[in-house]
UniProtKB/Swiss-Prot annotation:
Pfam families: Methyltransf_23. One of its GO terms (biological process) is methylation. It catalyses: a 3-demethylubiquinol + S-adenosyl-L-methionine = a ubiquinol + S-adenosyl-L-homocysteine + H(+); a 3-(all-trans-polyprenyl)benzene-1,2-diol + S-adenosyl-L-methionine = a 2-methoxy-6-(all-trans-polyprenyl)phenol + S-adenosyl-L-homocysteine + H(+). The gene is ubiG. This is Ubiquinone biosynthesis O-methyltransferase. InterPro entries: SAM-dependent_MTases_sf, UbiG_MeTrfase.
Length: 248
């Protein structure tokens, strides 16, 4: 990257997640909400990817032969199960500590993931391209959302997909995803999310459309305390996911 160029990296966020790196794979630790969230996002990714690429979602390895980027992969909570679906996965994160934890866990689990301590900009500048880009629970932690989305979009191959998951910038989200989750329920460490860094759907859709991608699906996600599970929902006021495709 040239000197003075814009960057998507918020070093404070990188440092904060690096400090918690040892907790990534603890289902009762600081990343417990992501462990709970994983089944619904994995199901969404599998089903939409199979629909796009003409695969059977019930097969053992439905993503066989597809190249997938998990940007901001953290400790690999998403990278590993996607690799188990047959995909060739690149897990990228700017934190060396996160990548170290992810690599160690994958090796111990017998899962092949290409983990790299790199930024989205570095991958794009190297000309890397993917059938699927996973941009999950990352945009609310970057320094420049528009640049980050544009950079990720560049790496989506013709006919390929980008999945985005984040938290909406609404008062409802401030009350539930920040105040309640961090201060009352203690699901997350205080300071995990800042209201001003939350992202509205249109702020993601605009740079994706400007990059030549078409928004093909939107869904909310909510936590059902009775079933203790996350479910897809029409309500996008708090957690939501977007799907966009680059025309073939």
């Amino acid at each position: 990257m040239t000197e003075g160029a814009r960057s998507t990296i918020d070093q404070g966020e990188v440092n904060r997640f690096s400090a918690m790196a040892a907790e990534w794979w603890s289902p009762t630790g600081k990343f417990k909400p992501l462990h709970k969230f994983n089944p619904v996002r994995l199901g969404y990714i599998r089903d939409k990817a199979c629909e796009n690429f003409g695969r059977d979602p019930k097969s053992a390895r439905p993503l066989e032969g597809l190249r997938v980027l998990d940007i901001g992969c953290g400790g690999g909570l998403l990278s590993e199960p996607v690799a188990r679906m047959g995909a060739s996965v690149v897990g990228a994160d700017p934190s060396e500590k996160n990548i170290g934890i992810a690599s160690t866990h994958a090796k111990a689990s017998g899962v092949s993931v290409d983990y790299r301590a790199v930024t989205a900009e570095e991958l794009a500048e190297a000309g890397e391209t993917f059938d699927i880009v996973l941009n999950m629970e990352v945009v609310e932690h970057v320094a420049d959302v528009e640049l980050f989305m544009t950079t990720c979009a560049k790496m989506v191959r013709p006919g390929g997909l980008i999945f985005v998951a984040t938290i909406n910038r609404t008062m409802k989200a401030a009350a539930l995803a920040i105040f309640a989750a961090e201060n009352i329920l203690r699901w997350l460490p205080r300071g995990t999310h800042q209201y001003e860094k939350l992202v509205r759907p249109e702020e993601l859709e605009k740079p994706l459309a400007a990059s030549g991608l078409e928004i093909t699906d939107r869904t909310g996600v909510f936590f059902n305390p009775l079933s203790n599970q996350w479910k897809l929902s029409r309500d996008m006021d708090v957690n939501y996911m977007l799907l966009a495709k680059r025309p073939a």
